[in-house]
């Protein structure tokens, strides 16, 4: 059973016909993502799953404006992310996050768990460093 946490149907993130191709040689390209459409609404959580190498990380990097798209459009709160200023990119990344396939490899083993969890909050001025 899916519980609807939203108070309305506010569209937060939308991908339209999102495609990413990589040039692998002079005459060949590899299509990592092909015409993907996605609509995310306020209060919802989404997990992207698939086989290794199917384009999950590429797709998510495009959504976070970390990877240029080959074609298509991405809108965050109704605005085209390709036209975002640096401040708008920074703001959007406070709300769009990615957990890698092996999250254990992403953590610094020399940091305490509390420090790992609070670091992004401190970086985004959501928590004061004590």
Please place each PLM-identified region on the residue numbering.
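The feature captures the beta-strand-to-loop junction immediately N-terminal to the Walker
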Residues: 49-51
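ABC ATPase NBD coupling module
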Residues: 26-27, 81-97, 123
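Helix-to-loop junction immediately C-terminal to a conserved catalytic motif
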Residues: 64
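ABC nucleotide-binding domain signature
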Residues: 47, 90-101, 115
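Short helical segment in ABC ATPase nucleotide-binding domains corresponding to the A-loop/adjacent helical element
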Residues: 104, 110-123
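Conserved ABC transporter NBD signature motif
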Residues: 72-80
């Amino acid at each position: 059973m899916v519980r609807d946490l939203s108070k309305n149907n506010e569209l937060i993130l939308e991908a339209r016909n999102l495609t990413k191709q990589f040039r692998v040689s002079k005459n060949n390209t590899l299509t990592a993502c092909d015409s993907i459409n996605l609509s995310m609404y306020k209060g919802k959580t989404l997990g992207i799953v698939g086989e290794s190498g199917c384009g999950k990380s590429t797709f998510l990097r495009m959504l976070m404006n970390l990877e240029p798209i080959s074609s298509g459009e991405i809108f965050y709160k109704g605005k085209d992310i390709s036209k975002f200023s640096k401040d708008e990119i920074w703001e959007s990344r406070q709300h769009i996050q990615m957990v890698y396939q092996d999250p254990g490899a992403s953590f610094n083993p020399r940091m305490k768990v509390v420090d790992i969890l609070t670091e992004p909050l401190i970086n985004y001025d959501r928590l004061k460093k004590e």
